[in-house]
């Protein structure tokens, strides 16, 4: 069982889209998946067909403020093998509310570890959708994760932002989670008609080498439409270019297991 945070400090890079479609792809391969929506915007929540207007106690906020345990807030989605812990805007207040707790960075790890130890075999993967900033919530996710998946938009300044993110990850490894690894970098919003996309791809592959997945996710209007219908694009339109790319990426992600094993 692996806990993987999907992270980028920049918004609008396809982070949540990657979470919900990787989760859907893995679930269709009979993998049991738990998505944790750790973004106060709640986009992973609505993108999987649930409401981000639920009572705050019944969301990840309830777990992190101590009013609920993990097992009490897990919700079934409409998709087989795919569960979620939802989020809503109240989560944005957690950093202020826990200001006096010196161990607050470890709250999620403590709660999640306790649950998974009691229910071994419940899930093959836990995927955490991080907020697009280096906030307390992001630190919580990094502390409890085995590895990180980084969506990288193939646009100007993308690599500069990625370099900053890598520095942040190194600081977390030194102080809070020495076993944290980069599982891979996924190129998103790729436009083959645009020279900039191919340039960013080349620079990313030259610098990060095997960490960059072979699969690239194209710009595709269906990827933008699907969340408004409360479903992953893999289900909303299986034949569109975005779906085909995420199916391919899911296969590549699974095939990593033979090379990285449980240490990922």
Question: What is the meaning of each model-derived region?
Answer:
Residues 1-264:
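P-loop NTP-binding core
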């Amino acid at each position: 069982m692996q806990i993987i945070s999907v992270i980028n400090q920049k918004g609008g890079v396809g982070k949540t889209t990657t979470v919900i479609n990787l989760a859907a792809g893995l679930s269709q391969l009979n993998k049991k998946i738990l998505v944790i929506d750790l973004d106060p915007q709640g986009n992973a929540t609505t993108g999987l067909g649930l409401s981000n207007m639920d009572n705050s106690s019944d969301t990840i906020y309830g777990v992190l403020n101590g009013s609920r345990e993990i097992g009490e807030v897990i919700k079934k989605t409409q998709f087989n093998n795919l569960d979620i812990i939802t989020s809503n805007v109240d989560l944005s207040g957690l950093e202020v509310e826990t200001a006096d707790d010196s161990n607050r960075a470890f709250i999620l790890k403590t709660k999640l570890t306790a649950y998974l130890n009691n229910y071994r075999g419940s899930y093959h993967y836990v995927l955490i959708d991080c907020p697009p900033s280096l906030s307390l919530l992001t630190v919580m996710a990094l502390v409890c994760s085995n590895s990180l998946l980084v969506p990288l938009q193939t646009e100007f300044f993308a690599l500069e932002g990625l370099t900053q993110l890598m520095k942040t990850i190194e600081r977390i490894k030194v102080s809070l989670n020495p076993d944290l690894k980069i599982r891979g970098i996924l190129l998103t919003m790729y436009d083959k008609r645009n020279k900039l996309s191919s340039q960013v791809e080349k620079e990313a592959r030259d610098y990060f080498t095997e960490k960059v997945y072979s699969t690239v996710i194209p710009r595709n209007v269906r990827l933008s439409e699907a969340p408004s219908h409360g479903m992953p694009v893999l289900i909303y339109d299986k034949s569109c270019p975005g779906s085909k790319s995420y199916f391919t990426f899911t296969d590549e992600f699974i095939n990593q297991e033979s090379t990285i094993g449980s240490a990922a």
